[in-house]
Structure formats: C-alpha cells, structure tokens
C-alpha cells in the first residue's frame, strides 16, 4: 500500500515501541500495522509470523533483534515506527533507535509492571529526552493489575504517570476502557478471535455505574494536572467551569512533549482491545518533528562552533545514519533519519564524519522488510537508502556545500567473547566476508585475531548476542566453523602512579641505527564510555622533535592492547611524556614508537597492575519459597545482593555478579526453583578481580 510521504510535518510521528522482552511489544506493533491497513493477516509472535520480526532467528526465538522501521497511516497522519528489541543483549539497537525518534510508546506487562529491562530502556530514553506515552498491555492476563503497574511506574522509574484511561474488567473479563478525557466507555464485545473485524470496531457507551466513582476520582486528578499548565485554565477550573476536550488534549500534549508527565493507557494487543485509542494518543500527545528542538551539530573544522538545523525542506540537507542492514536482494541498506533539507535519489552527499563522498542510490520507506520506493528524502522522515559504501552507524550525511557533524552515539564495550575456527580454507574466506558485513550492521560486535593461536575471536554483549551472530554466520553466509566456549572479556588497569620512568631504545647494526630516549609518567584515570586512555605531552624546548611525539603515543597505545598481567587490554591509564632526546641521524618515528611501547610496559609493571572483570546487574524474580536457595546460589557466585523487593506474588532480588560466574546460570536457576524463577542480566561495570581469583586467571593464561 504505497501512500505518499506527508510533507506537512505536523502530521508526522517518528516513534518507537519500547518494552521489556515479553511485555507484548511486537504484538502491539503488529496490531498497529493491522489497524492502519498495512497487513491483512495479523502475524502472531507465537506462530513465528510477525511482520516486524524478519530475521529467521527472530521468528524462531519469538524476540525482536533488529529494529525494523515501518511507515503506516492513521487518520490522515503518518507514523514511522521503529520496533526495538527488549532483550538486554541488544541494548545497542534500542540506543540507536532512541537517538532518532521524537517520541515512544512504552509497553508494560499489566501483571509484572515495570520489569528490569523496562527500566534500562526507560533510562536510555531519558538520556535522549524522548517523550513517552505508556500502554499497560496484557490486561486480559491472569493476575493483571492496572493500578499496581501505575504504582511501579512511580516507584521504580520515579516518573510522573498521568492516567487518561481506566480498564473495564480485568483478566478474562477485560472488555474495554474508560476514556477519562471524554468521559465515555469504549468496549470491544466481539469474540476476540472469531470477530471478523478483529477488534476493529468498538462501541462507545456510558461509563458503567460500578466504575463511575473511580472514573470521577481519576478525572479530578487529570483535570488538576492539566489546569496547572496554564493560568487561564486554572482560573476556569477553580471557577467551576468545564474544560473542553480540546483544551484538555492541548494541555496533555504540552506536558507530554516536555516530558513532564507520561499519559497512561491500557488494553490487550493480543485480544485486539485498546489499540486504536492508543494510536489516537500517539497522534494527540506525542511530538511531531516540528515539536522537538532543532538539531544541533558542529562545524567540520571546529568542534566548538555549534550549527543548528531546523526540520525544514528549505534548509541545507543533513541526516544521521542509525542502522546498516544487509537486505537479501538489495545488499546494503542504510537507515537514515533526515533532520533538514531534502535530496533526490542519485544525488551526491558527503559523509562529514569520515570526510567521504557518497551517492544516494534507491530510496525506500520501509514496511518491515518490504519496501516502498520514493524519489527523494525530506526533512522529518526515516528512510532506507541503497548505495552508501562507507557510511556506518552514527555517521552524518550532509550537503557538500554546507557541512555539519551531528552528535553520534556511544556504544558499550563488549563483555563476552568466543573463539571461532573455520573448518576449511573456503570457510575462512566466507568468515572474513561474514565478519565484515555483521560488523557494519552492529557496532557492539567486534573481532580480533589471536596472535598466538591464529584463531578469530568474536566479541559481543552477551551469550544470546553471540549465539545469534554465530547462527547468522552459518545461515546467511554458509560458514562451517567450530565455536569455542564463551570467555569473559577481562581488562587490566593500574592502581599506582610511576612519576618518572626513563627508557632508551638503541640499535646499531651498521648503517643508520635506531635511537630514541624518553621519560614518561603513568597514572590511573577514570574510565568513561568515551575515554579509556589519555596521552599528555609536557616536553619543552624541542628535546623530542614534534614529529616524533605522536609515535610515542602510538607505541603506548600498542602496548595497551596486550596487558602485562595476562595479556588483556589495559584501560584507565593516563600517560604523560615528560622529557627525552633524539639523534639527528638515528632517530625515527619507528624508534620512538618502540620506545613508547617498551617504556610503558616497564612502567606498568611498577604501577600495581590489577585485573578487572565485568560485573553484571542481575535481577531474579522468584516465588518466596525459593528465595533462600536463590540468594545462597548468588552468594556462591561471588554475587553482592543489592536489594530485595516484593512484586506481584514474587520476590525480586537484585545483585551484582561477575560475568565469569554466570555461565550456565539459566539451567541452575531452573532446577533450583522448578522452573518458576526468571532472571535478567545487563552489564553493570568493571570491577577489580579478588587476588586469589586473579592469580588463577593469570596462571591459566601463562600456562596456555
């Protein structure tokens, strides 16, 4: 169903659907696509037929891994939806989706309330200032409790929900919602599966008598919040005058766009109830590209010089690439969010992040993995583009005559790795291609060659992440390979400072020799997502010629790759070049690079080197009778219990546990709790490994 791209940006919404892994996010998106007329048969996740889940593994596992971008239309408005994965191993997908969205629908499970992953995703959305509406889903589920879920939004997220709907009935008796803005009831009475319209029709009725008091109570709270936005409304409200529906909606919109409140709706996507009012709320309350602040970037030559781009087709062209995917027919697809200007297919643009020219090939607006070709891209929209060769996630594309670099995204370092060995020479070549393609798509996927064993090591964000990457290598690229056991990505750092360390590199073997003399200081520094190492030059009087100083830095960075304790990369080090000397004939960049590397290795040995390991934030939900066993087990894994809370019928235990102790945890937890407990885990931070454990790791690495 090809409809034209809307040029009136007031009628455009770029939104994401975000949630915990099982809150029903993909089902909700499927229903949106059904009601907006794009799919004719609803894809059920448990049939493996969901339209948005388009990679083979997604359909098998029933989880969404890649954020498919879809365009649909609702009441003459255009909604561009990005479906984001809720599994913690795929935080990078969520992060890059949020970066290019204007608003989001946070889907919560009506029984579980705010779950750990909902919290992680919510915090990521806070980071990018994304306005949200909340959809309490699965109201038909046994144990569903709308009011409990709203409480968890307050208590666990510290957010300010504004209830604009109440459920009519719950569990098997859930049949509709009360609209508190228009004070009416919407009911879906058809058989949830047999109804030909699949919930497309609903009745508008009077509010049921038994819910009238509750509706009045929540309506009063709603009006109070709304009236406070504006003096004129406040006067009207306290003067006893009725506020009009238009006034209420405008006030809710203003508060939502400013992220002061989060409207809460409810329904059951699976039972086709409550989805259309949620779509209305997307249009009524979430921002259009014109409601969000203009995009800021900086000058290509001067990072301090800020440039503003408004979402207007007359401004110079600028766009951010937020995802690269390999399409079975078209090859490399780059998803872009266009922030300003417009540009036609076939035009030349510049990738200002890399300083490379690119040509825009075919352009599509995507429906999951089907494509609707368009002739040009225009401000405020999301597109998939073919033909970009050098552009990767986070790069800026812009007008060659009017360049800008938009703020990119930061991605976490991988915490887990696995060795992979191709079975034949042909597989070795295929593996090379697979690695290159997958790394283009996924910035948290890294690879390296182990110098000693010659093995290829792939690194990722968790066991599921690596499983899926290996699975894709086998399926999409036909790589036959043996895969090792997952290994923890340890790091090394220093705890002490070495104020002065001298090193002279001298080599004389006839002809011109090599000479470099340096004095360095090394000290610990705080590690951030952007910075794990710093180099400072304090040499005065030209004692080390300027052209050799970058070589010292490069030598130290080389040495950081292979730590001195057990060969793991070193982080959290600041190195300062204090002094040195050069020889007119024998000094060279190579000599100073070697000196930098050797001086650092020697100094690091004296600087109290220690081993670091990834600590995972683990949350376990268990029935109370197994709580003692679960806590005992976490303690035996060197876990530190952080908190214990009550949630609906279960105990929630949060702990920090070293990743190395969490392999195989899912099976152990199942057997200890008869399969009734569930857990989730996300990367927390790096922490020092206790000495006894560190000694064992060092010995093992040296013995290999």
Swiss-Prot record:
**Keyword Cytoplasm attached:** yes
| Gene3D superfamilies per the UniProt record, alphabetical | 3.30.230.10, 3.30.70.240, Elongation Factor G (Translational Gtpase), domain 3, P-loop containing nucleotide triphosphate hydrolases, Translation factors
Biological processes annotated in GO: ribosome disassembly
Residues annotated to bind GTP? 19-26, 83-87, 137-140
Q: Write out the annotated subcellular location.
A: Cytoplasm
Keywords in alphabetical order:
Cytoplasm, Elongation factor, GTP-binding, Nucleotide-binding, Protein biosynthesis
- Which family does the record claim for this protein? Belongs to the TRAFAC class translation factor GTPase superfamily. Classic translation factor GTPase family. EF-G/EF-2 subfamily.
Q: Name it.
A: Elongation factor G
What organism is the protein native to? Clavibacter sepedonicus (Clavibacter michiganensis subsp. sepedonicus)
- Gene for this chain: fusA
